[in-house]
A protein has these predicted regions:
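PRPP-associated nucleotide enzymes
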Residues: 1-173
Length: 173
């Protein structure tokens, strides 16, 4: 299945000069969504993943579905102030500004967590979540899975430089 057919490009959004790849074309099509989730589940089972760390907010869509199908727990990585209880927190630079991501201190990740998001561009968000995981939890390896990988941007290399093993479903060269 060519998922690029289901990903419309929205020019000049969220700011001028940015061509936004809209994953809602996948989420509104059950066949495309199912195909995507099957690929993510394969990544989970092939790598003996112990938990999925879902990135706020579009990562939740894919992580929830993949978690159910693979019987893998889903932990939420959210923007600052969105999680109850005590949290670990890390501020990082994004493509457009700075942001803060948090994980609950009582999260159970296991030895092989998988960070899941909709899109990889510069890698900032996944690297921030990776930082939180490695600073605060005991893990063997950290993996990442994204629906869309913008290979012309430095994200994939940034993840490799931090020993994060990446699976991507749709690649844009």
């Amino acid at each position: 299945m060519n998922l690029k057919e289901y990903i419309p490009v929205v020019p000049n959004w969220p700011k001028p000069g940015v061509n936004f790849l809209d994953i809602s074309g996948i989420t509104i099509n059950p066949l495309a969504m199912s195909y995507c989730v099957e690929r993510l589940v394969k990544c989970i089972t092939d790598n003996d993943i112990t938990s999925i760390v879902a990135v706020d907010s579009r990562g939740f869509l894919f992580a929830g579905a993949a978690g159910i199908q693979s019987a893998t727990p889903v932990v939420l990585a959210r923007k600052k102030g969105k999680l109850p209880g005590e949290c670990y927190s890390h501020t990082y630079a994004t493509e457009y500004s700075t942001d803060t991501v948090e994980l609950q201190k009582n999260s159970v990740l296991g030895a092989r967590p998988l960070i899941m998001d909709d899109l990889l561009a510069t890698g900032g968000t996944i690297l921030a979540v990776n930082y939180l995981i490695k600073q605060n939890f005991t893990v063997e390896s950290v993996f990442a899975a994204v629906v869309i990988n913008l290979k012309f941007l430095p994200g994939e290399k940034q993840l490799a430089d931090h020993s994060i093993l990446l699976t991507s479903i749709v690649n844009y060269e």
